[in-house]
């Protein structure tokens, strides 16, 4: 009897918690989307992208535009050798 009661209790708990949990995850997703698309985060992403481009260009000894024109295999060979 205890197993059946435990099973019923778990099933009812799951049915009650699923909509509440879905609401929490929806709120987290919506809030994260707002933060990700905010102006300060866009500025930080831009700075990080520029820093990464400059680092790679310095590492391979080319300007960022030259690095963008290189074939991928050549680019990876240069990074592997240095």
From Swiss-Prot:
Q: Which InterPro entries match?
A: Antimicrobial_7 (IPR012526)
Read off the domain note. Answer: Forms an alpha-helical structure in membrane-mimicking environment.
Cleavable signal peptide: 1-22
| Propeptide stretches in the record | 66-82
The entry sums up its family as follows: Belongs to the non-disulfide-bridged peptide (NDBP) superfamily. Long chain multifunctional peptide (group 2) family.
Show the stretches that span the lipid bilayer. Answer: none
Q: Which organs or tissues contain this protein?
A: Expressed by the venom gland.
Q: What is this protein called?
A: Antimicrobial peptide Smp43
**Primary location class:** secreted
Could you tell me what this protein does?
A: Antimicrobial peptide with moderate activity against Gram-positive bacteria and Gram-negative bacteria, as well as low activity against fungi. Acts by inducing bacterial membrane disruption. Shows activity against B.subtilis (MIC=4 ug/ml), S.epidermidis (MIC=64 ug/ml), S.aureus (MIC=32 ug/ml), E.coli (MIC=128 ug/ml), K.pneumoniae (MIC=64 ug/ml), P.aeruginosa (MIC=64 ug/ml), and C.albicans (MIC=128 ug/ml). Does not show hemolysis activity.
Provide the disulphide bond pattern: none
Which keywords describe this protein according to UniProt?
Antibiotic, Antimicrobial, Membrane, Secreted, Signal, Target cell membrane, Target membrane
Q: Where in the cell is it found?
A: Secreted; Target cell membrane
